């Protein structure tokens, strides 16, 4: 039963991804902002910052910071405005901390800032990548480097996995699986470039550069996966939420995507010369 639930959710996710990534623009920006806020809520709950299921003023300031950063990046696509939004969020959180002292402890302040920064800053890179030149194609590399990597790593690990990658944190993951995930992502990325980017740009070199970008993204995606797992282990929870049947929460499904998105964005800018 769980298999079919997970499969059904996966199909729905793929369909929604197709709709929103093809749409791009304000639609995708709004979706990224919604994902950021949902993931923020999941992290706040996981880290036990909220009390009695109610948001405090401190957490509300973190949420406002996410909205401010998302709006700044959508409207300007300028990292200077983004940095300004992050600074304002920090100042707002500290303002609440100082003028409500000793209601909040320092570790609560740092946790709120972390929970807001993690999804709030990383999710918008999906939107920013979509807005690059060739962005309607490049944005898919984020998911090739995360979800394809995850699938290839799982299949490779099942077939030949012997050496543990992170035995304490994730006993089922193997070094062989991790390598298989990277290789699989590189191959799928190369195929994707051959089918879409070479006809679009006329450059045969795209196949090699995109394979490299996909491989780099796949390496980082596995760090993202393990990072989210570490937080769950620290707080003794199985899943971040139940919003996606069979998968858990937004953080459970997008943990690797969050780390991959900025890597794909910056490598696309640096190696491919993509611009807004």
Q: Can you annotate each of these PLM segments?
A:
Residues 188, 192, 263-268:
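Hydrophobic alpha-helical transmembrane segments that constitute the membrane-spanning cores
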Residues 215-223, 250-258:
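Hydrophobic transmembrane alpha-helical segments of multi-pass transport and channel proteins
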Residues 185-186, 253, 260, 269:
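Hydrophobic transmembrane alpha-helices of multi-pass small-molecule transporters
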Residues 266-276:
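Juxtamembrane boundary at the C-terminal end of a transmembrane helix
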Residues 95, 194, 223-239:
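Transmembrane alpha-helical segments of integral membrane proteins
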Residues 233-256:
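Interfacial loop-to-transmembrane junctions
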Residues 147-158, 221-233:
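Short helical (or helix-break) motifs at transmembrane helix termini and adjacent helical loops
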Residues 1-215:
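Membrane-embedded alpha-helical bundles of polytopic integral membrane proteins
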């Amino acid at each position: 039963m769980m298999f079919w639930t997970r499969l059904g959710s996966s199909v729905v996710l793929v369909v929604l991804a197709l709709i929103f990534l093809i749409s791009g623009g304000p639609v995708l920006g709004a979706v990224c902002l919604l994902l950021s806020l949902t993931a923020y809520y999941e992290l706040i709950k996981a880290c036990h910052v909220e009390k009695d299921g109610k948001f405090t003023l401190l957490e509300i300031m973190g949420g406002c910071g996410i909205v401010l950063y998302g709006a700044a990046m959508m409207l300007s696509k300028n990292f200077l405005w983004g940095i300004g939004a992050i600074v304002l969020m920090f100042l707002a959180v500290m303002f609440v901390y100082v003028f409500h002292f000793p209601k909040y402890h320092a570790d609560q302040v740092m946790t709120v800032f972390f929970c807001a920064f993690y999804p709030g800053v990383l999710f918008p890179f999906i939107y920013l990548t979509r807005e690059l030149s060739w962005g309607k194609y490049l944005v898919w590399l984020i998911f090739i480097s995360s979800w394809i990597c995850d699938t290839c790593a799982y299949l490779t690990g099942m077939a030949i996995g012997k050496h543990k990658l992170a035995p304490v944190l994730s006993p089922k993951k193997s070094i062989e699986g991790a390598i298989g995930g990277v290789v699989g992502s590189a191959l799928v990325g190369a195929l994707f470039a051959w089918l879409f980017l070479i006809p679009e740009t006329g450059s045969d070199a795209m196949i090699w550069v995109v394979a490299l970008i996909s491989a780099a993204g796949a390496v980082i995606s596995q760090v993202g996966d393990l990072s989210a797992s570490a937080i769950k282990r620290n707080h003794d929870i199985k899943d971040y939420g139940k919003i996606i049947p069979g998968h858990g929460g937004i953080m459970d499904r997008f943990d690797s995507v969050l780390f991959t998105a900025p890597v794909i964005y910056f490598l696309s800018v640096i190696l491919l010369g993509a611009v807004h």
